[in-house]
Regions:
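Regulatory nucleotide-sensing modules
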Residues: 1-39
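Short histidine-centered beta-strand/loop micro-motifs
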Residues: 23-29, 47, 67-69, 109-112
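Short beta-strand segments in beta-sandwich/barrel cores
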Residues: 40-46, 64
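Cyclic-nucleotide recognition modules
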Residues: 49-107
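Polybasic "coupling" helices that flank or enter modular domains
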Residues: 97-155
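Conserved small/polar residues in nucleotide/adenosyl-binding loops
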Residues: 159-166
Length: 166
């Protein structure tokens, strides 16, 4: 994984290729500004060692990441597809919608469903409805999700093959 640190004191467009991550340091950013996704899909996650890269949100074109509300260690933004975002955009005060908070609440709700099958169905439902598309009896997401990431998102381990028996 390519990883860059980004404080970003000047307003500019930042471009990341699929798989790159950037650490957003809130202490080096002007107050009252945010990042705004121009194109692509990003995963926002916590860089703290204790939370092991916990996913907070997925962002797409037009979504804003308020950097003044982040924890002191900041957050990481990972490009799930080729990504570009504007730095130091003024926060849309009257929008009434915070994409990161909305995603975090939905992911928390999914993790509290009764069993792994329910959590998996709920996860794919929200991902397809917001970021993907249905294609008959299957669905398509514009990025790859590993078994490890799916397990992290639904709060359980996923096994792709049965364990050997003696």
């Amino acid at each position: 994984m390519n990883f860059h640190s980004y404080g970003g004191s000047s307003s500019k467009t930042v471009r990341l290729v699929t798989g790159q991550s950037v650490l957003i340091d809130p202490s080096s950013r002007p107050r009252g500004t945010c990042l705004e996704v121009e194109s692509g899909i990003a995963r926002v996650y916590c860089p703290c060692e204790e939370t092991e890269g916990m996913t907070l949100a997925f962002l797409q074109s037009g979504d804003q990441l308020r950097t003044d509300l982040l924890c002191s260690e900041g957050v990481c933004v990972e490009a799930l597809t080729d990504l570009s975002f504007h730095s130091n955009v003024n926060i849309a005060e009257n929008s009434g919608f915070d994409a990161v908070n909305e995603w975090t609440l939905q992911l928390l709700r999914i993790r509290h469903l009764g069993n792994a099958e329910q959590r998996l169905q709920a996860l794919f439902s929200i991902l397809v409805n917001r970021l993907g598309r249905r294609c008959g009896q299957w669905c398509e997401l514009p990025f790859r999700l590993t078994h490890e990431r799916i397990g992290e998102l639904i709060g359980c381990l996923l096994y792709t093959s049965p364990s050997p028996r003696d």
